[in-house]
Amino acid sequence: MKRLRDLTAVLGMVALTACNNASIEGSWVEPVPGMPGMQQGFVLDGDGSASSINMATLKYEAWKKVGNRLLLSGTSIGNHQNISFTDTLTIEKLTQDSLILKRGELLLKYARNNE
């Protein structure tokens, strides 16, 4: 009986661990402020490359996950100048279908885009 209880506990821990191992790779979108029905976001590819979704002046190029931080690098395209940047965001929550990032006091809520 004790072995069955121990086995059940171990299997439960394995199942919980598997549920919390959501991948950050993929397409993530959020609503565009002030533009109902429009979305913007980014794609995180498995090779460390990144790209922007519906953001003409913010071109993501690379990403890296370090602990609970997401580093997004790219180029900000402005009038007659391009500026390289790296955004450091704290990963507050990651599930199979949602990603919540924090930059300072700002919370950014993304949904996985499966299209």
Label the model's feature ranges.
Residues 1-19:
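Sec-dependent bacterial lipoprotein signal peptides
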Residues 17-115:
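Lipid interaction determinants
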